[in-house]
Amino acid sequence: MKLTIHEIARLVGAKNDVSVYPDSPLVKAEFDSRLIGAGDLFVPLKGARDGHDFIETAFENGAVVTLSEKEVADHPYILVEDVLTAFQALAAYYLQKTGVDVFAVTGSNGKTTTKDMLAHLLSTSYKTYKTQGNYNNEIGLPYTVLHMPDDTEKLVLEMGQDHLGDIHLLSELAHPKTAIVTLVGEAHLAFFKDRSEIAKGKLQIADGMEKGSLLLAPSDPIAEDYLPADKKVVRFGPGAELEITDLIERKDSLTFKANFLEKSLDLPVTGKYNATNAMIASYVALQEGVSEEQIGQAFQNLELTRNRTEWKKADNGADILSDVYNANPTAMKLILETFSAIPANEGGKKIAVLADMKELGDQSVQLHNQMILSITPDALDTVIFYGEDIAELAQLASQMFPIGHVYYFKKTAEEDQFEAMVKQVKESLGAHDQILLKGSNSMNLAKLVESLQED
């Protein structure tokens, strides 16, 4: 991080005199005092706990200066009105100072995978950095910016939204050169009036872009009203400017051809939605001068963020399709379609473990129930449901499947039948079986994956 104490003080409009402090260069910025090292800037954010309570600890760990909303005795500090606002302003300034090209990615489904793919492709020709983990909000994005290596040329930022306006703030901070909206679904519907408002929020990713900048968006009528007229909008999907013309799906890989590619591309991941993600990433990479040959080679050693549609092996030999980081109706429908289309192993069953999708608001039960259209005894032998809002879906499924092939386990404020669910999964799972696990992160299905691998 090529910034000094005095430079930061000028930028954030320090309310105190910092000229009495040495103009020391800073190593990095941290808001967790436990991660502070020698030469760091401490950023005491207010959350469940007030970061100001840990300023002393930060200096004990090596901090040379701290932002602060109040006077600090005995240590160098930069007095500001609001630490978070100063943190964000610092990140925006640093992007401007470095001149790095920013690529922003959002979407109700596929944003993390697309971010990973695009960063991987760009890294074949440029020094590239990307959002780590789920650092995609008003705190995580500036943290990512201030942690990128000094030689970064291309920065791929994931942008998430919980409320309308979240992405507007992030876009105005980052000023993307190129932006991608992967899909407009029902994620976080608890915080939005409807899917149209979700689309409005997602398309705010263009708010911080210059006129004529490239914006990739799904060919979806609900998004049309929010597409900016002053950007170069390229739509993707069936019949759109970018579309997949050929697709071969396998259990753990796929091959696809797009209308702008000369050759087919092979991917070491499953799911036709991942073909769309790869198509988007490929198109942007081509605009940046990455060759089609480089793209094809890069996809051969693609590594994605953990728990995104990942095949694993159970201890008993069964195949686990783990997709447990997050869930929304669109994502669950897509993974059920993908899993259902995969042929069963010889002598094996196909089992699905489905858990609650969170943050769907008043429509949650209804949206869960709609998943019945993607659940069929023709493709699945056994379905195990876990949660609260998923209970009615379990009842609907029990009317379609033979007795003993549908199970439901509660997770409510009063009762959590997680251990009983795990026991049933293990009793149902044979050595030649395939099992899908899908649910929101808070449903803790990652722990079930670990349990199946450890026994």
Spell out what each predicted region is.
Residues 49, 305, 324-401:
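Active-site beta-alpha connecting loops in nucleotide-dependent enzymes
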Residues 33-43, 128-129, 139, 143-154, ...:
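Mobile, glycine- and charge-enriched loop segments
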Residues 1-89, 270, 373, 378, ...:
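N-terminal leader/targeting and accessory segments in enzymes
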Residues 105, 306-308, 434, 442, ...:
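ATP-dependent carboxylate/acyl-activation modules
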Residues 78-82, 405-421:
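Short acidic-hydrophobic, aromatic-tinged amphipathic segments that line or gate anion-handling sites
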Residues 68-74, 180-319, 341, 348, ...:
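Acidic, Mg2+-coordinating active-site environments of NTP-dependent enzymes
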Residues 6-12, 86-219, 223-232, 423, ...:
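Phosphate-binding loop of NTP-binding sites
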Residues 14, 69-70, 100-106, 180-186, ...:
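Short beta-strands and strand-loop turn motifs
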